[in-house]
Amino acid sequence: MPRMKDIPTKSSPGTDNSEKDEAVIEEDLSLNGQPFFTDNTDGGENEVSWTSSLLSTYVGCQPPAIPVCETVIDLTAPSQSGAPGDEHLPCSLNAETKFHIPDPSWTLSHTPPRGPHISQQLPTRRSKRRLHRKFEEERLCTKAKQGAGRPVPASVVKVGNITPHYGEELTRGDAVPAAPITPPYPRVQRPAQPTHVLFSPVFVSLKAEVCDQSHSPTRKQGRYGRVSSKAYTRQLQQALEEKDAQLCFLAARLEAHKEQIIFLRDMLMRMCQQPASPTDAPLPPC
């Protein structure tokens, strides 16, 4: 880089030498003896063409969207809605606020935390899980211990002054009998299926003991009134037999309807083939 003392100075025409002269830096804009601008155009025009060619690769790209909020944000004031997560939003969303989010990806990357801060959260109160009345009574009966921490059978339990729903008032030392087990499934009355087909020339009869569904299957109750696997298998087998009987009944009705349709078609063909008498009204064409 040339020094300031080596820079030649020249005065502008029409001015005195006492005026401040302009310092003209004449540097050789060349690189290894070759000019910097290869073409014969001006440097400014070449710079414009270089900028336009560089920006042509970014055609179609949009800058990242910036959310716009046209209200004054007061982060210290509580929200009007009272929601726990409103204080973390960029602004209050009311009727006068115009909040625009052009790019939905902004909401994904700036999701506000749910609820208040962890220091402001109160301990969650969880209610104690309540058992069924039957299991609760058994738990209270077996809570009394006998000997060195051994559980007492539910049939004979030493308890205090209690009044069960199935017994009288007891005193300490009396034996509490086991609670009676009630059947869990009430008997359901099902309507019996008809044993014949109406409006058919063929009378179809089925056995009453096959179509009768009024009887309920036998159930073997366990300790808590549950059905054993054998009884459940027996119930499924009986239900399958009932479905088979219903299918047989529907198949018989279908055959009866087919025969009835054939009978009506034959009657209609005979009526069309008979010559019409002059006294009778004319029949429509078949």
Curated annotation (Swiss-Prot):
GO biological process: bidirectional double-stranded viral DNA replication; protein sumoylation; symbiont-mediated perturbation of host cell cycle G1/S transition checkpoint
Chain segments carrying region Disordered: 1-22, 106-130
Presence of the UniProt keyword Ubl conjugation in the record: yes
Pathway: Protein modification; protein sumoylation
Enzyme Commission identifier(s): 2.3.2.-
Outcome of mutating L75A: Complete loss of SUMO E3 ligase activity
Keyword Ubl conjugation: yes
Single GO molecular function: transferase activity
Keywords: G1/S host cell cycle checkpoint dysregulation by virus, Host-virus interaction, Modulation of host cell cycle by virus, Transferase, Ubl conjugation, Ubl conjugation pathway
InterPro entries given in the database record: KSHV_K8 (IPR010805)
Superkingdom classification of source: Viruses
Protein modification: Sumoylated.
Subunit structure: Interacts with host HDAC1 and HDAC2, these interactions suppress HDAC activities. Interacts with protein ORF57. Interacts with protein vPK.
Its job: SUMO E3 ligase that plays a role in viral gene regulation and is essential for viral reactivation. Disrupts host G1 cell cycle control thus allowing viral transcription and translation to proceed at the early stages of infection. Catalyzes its own SUMO modification as well as that of its interacting partners such as host TP53 and RB1. Regulates viral gene expression and reactivation and may mediate the SUMOylation of viral promoters in the low methylated 'Lys-9' histone H3 (H3K9me) region which results in a diminution of viral gene expression after reactivation.
Protein name per UniProt: E3 SUMO-protein ligase K-bZIP
Gene that produces this protein: K8
